[in-house]
Amino acid sequence: AKGTGSVQYGTDALGGVIQLFSKEPDFTTGKAKLSGNGLIKYMSGNMEKTARASLTYSTERIAFTGGITLRDFGDLIGGDTTGKQTPSGYDEWSLNAKVKFLITKTIQLTISHQQLKQTHVPLYHRVKLENFALSEFDLQKHQLQYAKFEANTNLKWADKFTLIGSHQQTNEGRTSRRNGSNMLRNENDDVQ
């Protein structure tokens, strides 16, 4: 890591902004459309099992897409002499939904919700290297909601006006207990 931020925030520090766009549902012309997709993924060595189901519905004025994903990450298997890294596996589920409304030919409203929940995420390095019998994140939860209002214009100085309001919430719990100790330590951070 480079720069002064790497010292303050550690080697995982990331500078700048990354803007990612999730899947957009499309409006249809004519009849309403309904479709779905599914995905099942299995990785050998019990390292990952994933199942996802998604649904898309659209009309001339309303378009929706959403889905749910369930994941079971098993313990990591290292190469050479590392072997199985226990404990390192955890469970996760995520949910996403986005609906768009075509209010007029030039005005559109989008409402979106994303949610991720992870349970019993172990900190392998603390258990193996730092004398802990138990050290894990439980529970980790992140939610993001936003509403986006877009209006196309015929103005010379602007093609479109966009107004976005968003809210996000992160909850992180940590549980730990040192080897040979009966004291279980629970911590919780809730950021909005």
Which role does the model predict for each range below?
Residues 86-88, 106-160, 167-190:
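Flexible loop and strand-edge segments within Gram-negative outer membrane beta-barrel domains
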Residues 42-72, 82-120, 141-152:
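Transmembrane beta-barrel wall of Gram-negative outer-membrane proteins
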Residues 1, 10-16, 31, 90-92:
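Periplasmic N-terminal gating module of Gram-negative TonB-dependent outer-membrane receptors
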Residues 9, 25-34, 61, 106, ...:
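Short loop/turn motifs that connect adjacent beta-strands in outer-membrane beta-barrel proteins
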Residues 3-4, 23, 43, 116:
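Solvent-exposed coil/turn segments that connect beta secondary-structure elements
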Residues 14, 32-34, 49, 93, ...:
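Exposed loop/turn and edge beta-strand positions of beta-sandwich/beta-sheet ligand-binding modules
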Residues 13-39, 51-53:
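N-terminal periplasmic accessory domains that precede
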